[in-house]
A protein has these predicted regions:
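Extended accessory and catalytic-adjacent subdomains in large enzymes
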Residues: 3-306
Length: 306
């Protein structure tokens, strides 16, 4: 009943084909080194600064949806969102148009972006983001609009198609397109299409995000094996180091105005936040202290014994 797919792939339990897309991470998730963070973040800033002009070219019909310059915008925006929010990749690529908001409370400006948390089944959650990430999301709203419109047209065509031929695959595609039509991080895909039919619009997948991050790292001039899952842990470490008086260059660029608030106050500011992110920050606090103490101790036994 799953057409050309399978129960495991439809349910999201199957590994995607190809080692480069599979879940090959083993052991402890590495923290992105500070120099790599700086290189990648600065590169992303350059890409996003040039984005309005590139989008003007696209809107004028002089650039196609698959142009590398447009793909660089999407990749850079995904990295900035991930590293400044602490979202898991599935949550970041699930952000939809109009899902962010700002509010002032007791003289402090808060910016929130909502998405769906799948790992623990909590559902809708909100993440605290800096103002620069709001601007990136506004830019992505413009980036995604024509792709969303193309997907909406496909939805309408699928709904109006009365023929029984290939019905199962059409219904699966219709359900997926309806689910993804408001997402910001979209791509073009030939999956299931003939060359003559061209491409259709799809939501960026976890596998596609991994490829995007590796491409981003290479373009930024680093050989670090950058991966989406590293951003959440790196975000937690950046928060901890900031509060321990060791802010990185990147963190200083998007330092929250409410950084003097305690973690308890930050969590209490919005009950819809992802509590597990705060758990990871506390875990990194412990790791940081252990690393700090170990750095004080040399390799020589303190007793001086053999």
């Amino acid at each position: 009943p799953w057409g050309e797919s399978s129960l495991w792939r439809v349910s999201g339990l199957a590994k995607q084909p190809g080692n480069q897309f599979g879940r090959t991470e083993t052991g402890k998730t590495p923290i992105i080194p500070a120099d790599v963070q700086a290189k990648v973040f600065n590169y992303c800033e350059e890409v996003l600064a040039a984005a309005p002009e590139i989008l003007n070219e696209r809107d004028a019909g002089r650039l196609g949806f698959r142009n590398p310059a447009l793909i660089r915008i999407r990749d850079a925006a995904l990295y900035v969102l991930s590293i400044t929010s602490g979202m898991r990749n599935e949550e970041a690529i699930g952000v939809e148009s109009g899902s962010w908001r700002s509010e002032a409370r007791d003289g402090v400006q808060f910016h929130w972006v909502a998405t769906t948390e799948h790992k623990t089944g909590k559902g809708k959650v909100e993440f605290l983001i800096p103002e620069l990430t709001v601007k990136v999301l506004d830019l992505m709203n413009r980036y995604a609009k024509p792709l969303q419109e193309k997907m909406a047209l496909e939805v309408a065509e699928l709904e109006c198609n009365p023929t029984p031929q290939d019905l199962t695959n059409r219904m699966l595609r219709l359900a997926k397109a309806k689910r993804d039509v408001r997402k910001l991080f979209l791509c073009t895909s030939m999956s299931g299409q003939s060359e003559s039919a061209g491409y259709h619009v799809d939501a960026l997948s976890n596998g596609g995000s991994k490829v995007s991050f590796r491409r981003l790292a290479m373009a930024a001039g680093t050989d670090w094996q950058l991966a989406p899952h590293q951003c959440r842990k790196t975000y937690a470490r950046n928060i901890v180091e900031s509060r321990m008086g060791r802010s990185s260059l990147v963190f200083l660029k998007w330092q929250f105005k409410h950084s003097s608030m305690s973690m308890t106050q930050l969590y209490a500011s919005n009950p819809m936040q992802d509590a597990s992110l705060f758990d990871e920050v506390l875990e990194e606090m412990t790791n940081f202290k252990v690393d700090l103490i170990e750095s004080w101790l040399g390799d020589q036994p303190l007793s001086g014994g053999a």
